[in-house]
């Protein structure tokens, strides 16, 4: 099922899904793995675009590393910094259509047996975007 998500939401969902590690039905584990693959690919694309913005606008030292001051990347001037931050924010707010493998609620209900781990309420909240018909 195609879903439209902001890049920032994709990053958050990726981190949250990576934190789920239970003994669940095969179909649920497969959907988690498949969706992680899709979400990670989008994160990599966004990271590459962020890198491109920083490479164009940030100050680098003689080794090609970004210069930091007070834990922040240094820019040549305030105008360039604002431009870079705006572009980075635009990337983060981009809406991207991703193909999400959904599972029926009945698959999650299978976890209510001794055979599988029962997802916590936090894990259920993370999995919510994957629940379909």
List PLM regions with ranges.
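A composition-driven surface/loop motif
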Residues: 1-133
């Amino acid at each position: 099922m195609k879903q439209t998500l902001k890049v920032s939401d994709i990053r958050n969902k990726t981190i949250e899904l990576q934190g789920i590690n239970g003994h669940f039905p095969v179909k649920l584990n497969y959907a988690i793995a498949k969706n992680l693959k899709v979400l990670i690919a989008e994160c990599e694309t966004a990271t590459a675009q962020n890198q491109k913005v920083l490479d164009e606008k940030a100050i680098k030292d003689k080794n090609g590393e970004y210069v930091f001051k007070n834990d922040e990347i240094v820019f040549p001037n305030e105008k360039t910094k604002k431009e870079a931050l705006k572009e980075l924010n635009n990337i983060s707010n981009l809406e991207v259509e991703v193909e999400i493998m959904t599972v029926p609620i009945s698959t999650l209900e299978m976890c209510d047996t001794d055979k599988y781990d029962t997802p916590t309420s936090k894990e259920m909240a993370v999995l919510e975007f994957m629940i379909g018909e």
